[in-house]
C-alpha cells in the first residue's frame, strides 16, 4: 500500500489573469466550493481558456481529469498544462494503439478480422505513469481522450498489489522476484525494458512500467534490503539514493493467483453453458471455434497469468456480476476530484455514442463464436454510468451544446481576448450577383496580402466555384473530406505562405484552421437551415475570422433565419464587450503573427530553420523509394511520440497509412 502525498498546485507563467479571466476563475472556483455539480465556461476563441482552467485547478487543489475529443487536442492540452505546472504531475492517458483495428467479423463474406494493434510503448508508459500518480500524490492533472471511459482493471487490486521496497526491510531476493512475477513483471537479463527485471548476484534491477529511462536497483545483504538507488537504465549512472520505492503492476489487468483460479472456473462454467446453447441451435462451427479459442486463452492464463486479449475476460477477472459497470480510469480517482470537458459540444456526444458502437461490433463476434457473451462487459461506460461516476464537472466550449445548457443554471462567460482582437464585423448580402461580388471582395484582400475562406454547402458548388475562380486568375484551392491528411496540412500551410489566397470548403470547422492571415470568411447559402448552418456552426465559422484585426464575415442569404440572427446578435454582443474593454485599457487590437510551423517535417520546402535532413515525399516513387520513405517516416513518428509531440506523431501516422495504401 502507498500513501498519497499532498502537494499544492503551482502555476509557472509570466502573465496574471486579465480581462474577464479573473471573474471567470472566481465564479467557477466559488461554484466548485459550493458543491455545484455542473458549470460551463463559455469561452470565445482566443480568450485563454486553458489559462483559466489552470487557475481554477490551482485554486481548488483537487486531482483533475480533462477530457478532449481526440488525441491531437489532448496532446496540445498536455503540452500547455505541462508548461503551466512543471512542479506537479501532469499526465497523458489516451488509447495506446498507434494503429488499432479491433477484432470484427463480417458474416456476409465470412471474414474474421484479427485484432491488429501496434502498441505505442511511450503511450503505454504514460498510461501507467497516470494511474500510479493517482495513488502517490494528490496534485495530479490527467489529460485524456474519450478512451478514458473504456474498461480498465480493478483499481483496488492494482493498488493492493503494489510491491513496496524499503531500506532495512526483511525480505530475501527470491521473495522479491516472486512478488514481481505476481504483478506481471518478467525476468530478462539480456533485453532490459519496461515491465522487466534482471538479476546479478545480490542485486535486482527493476524497470517500472511507469518510467521512461529510470530503473530501480535493489541491493540485498543476506535477507535484508541494504540499499535502493535510482539508476539510468542506459548509462548505469546513479541518479539518487532512495529510502523507499513503490513498484506498481506492469498491467492494469492484474489479478491475484487465488482470484485468477476463481476467474478461470467462472470462464469454464460460462464456456460450458454457451457451447450447449450453440449446439442446441445446431451452430456446430461456432461452437468448435469458441471452444478452441477459449481453451487456448485459459491455458495461457494458467501458465502465464495472462493471455492476448485478456481484457475480454475482465468481468470474470474482477469477479463482477455479468452486466455490471466496468472499472475505468474514473475509478482510479479518489472521492474528491474534478472533471473538465474541453470542447464539450463535441466531446459529450462522443462519450454518449461510445457504448452503442462498441456493443454492435462485439455482438457479432459473440453470435458467431469468436467470443463468450461476457466479452460484452469489456466495454466503454454508458452515458448514465459516466454521469454516476463523475461528481463535479466544468464544461468548456465556445458554443455549449444542449446538455450543457440544460444542466447549467448560469454560463460563466469569458469573452475578452487579452490581445484586444474583436469578433469580426458581419454583413448579410443578397445572393443576386453573389459570385461577382465575392470576386471583388477577394481582390481587395489579395491586394492587402490577406487570405480568404469560403464555405459552401455542397461538393458540386465547391468544385464549380473553385474552377470559376481559377479561370478568373485567383490562386485558390479546394479542401474537401476526400483530401488526405498530408495534403490537407500542405494546403493550409500553402495558404499561410501565400501560395494560395483563397480556400473553398464545405466544413471548415475542423481543428487546424485557425489562421491569423485570414481576414475574410464568406458563408454562401447562409439561410439554408441545417447542421452546417446551425447557430453553433455559424458561430464557430465566424470565429475563423477572429484572429485578424481586420476580420470580416460576409453571409450571402435572401432571408434571415433564426440561426443567422442568433449568431449575428451573439457576435455583436461579444464584439461590444471587447470594444469597451479595449477603450477602458487603451488596447489597440493587433493580429498575432503565428510562426508558420511545419506540422510534419515531410512537407518542408523553404523553412529557414530547416537545417537537418527531413523526409521529403516526391510525387512519383519507385517501390524502393517508397519503402525508404516509409522507414524514414516511421522513425520520425516514433521520435515525435518520444518527444511527446503527439500532434506531429498523429499526422505522421496518417501519412504512413496513406503511403502504405498506395503501395
Curated annotation (Swiss-Prot):
It is found in: Cytoplasm. Residues 627-662 form the UVR domain. Keywords: ATP-binding, Cytoplasm, DNA damage, DNA excision, DNA repair, Excision nuclease, Nucleotide-binding, SOS response. The keyword Nucleotide-binding applies. One of its GO terms (molecular function) is ATP hydrolysis activity. One of its GO terms (cellular component) is cytoplasm. The keyword Membrane does not apply. A motif (Beta-hairpin) lies at residues 96-119. It comes from the Bacteria. CDD domains: DEXHc_UvrB, SF2_C_UvrB. Residues 30-414 form the Helicase ATP-binding domain. Residues 434-600 form the Helicase C-terminal domain. ATP binds at residues 43-50. GO terms for biological process: nucleotide-excision repair; SOS response. Belongs to the UvrB family. The UvrABC repair system catalyzes the recognition and processing of DNA lesions. A damage recognition complex composed of 2 UvrA and 2 UvrB subunits scans DNA for abnormalities. Upon binding of the UvrA(2)B(2) complex to a putative damaged site, the DNA wraps around one UvrB monomer. DNA wrap is dependent on ATP binding by UvrB and probably causes local melting of the DNA helix, facilitating insertion of UvrB beta-hairpin between the DNA strands. Then UvrB probes one DNA strand for the presence of a lesion. Forms a heterotetramer with UvrA during the search for lesions. Interacts with UvrC in an incision complex. The beta-hairpin motif is involved in DNA binding. This is UvrABC system protein B.
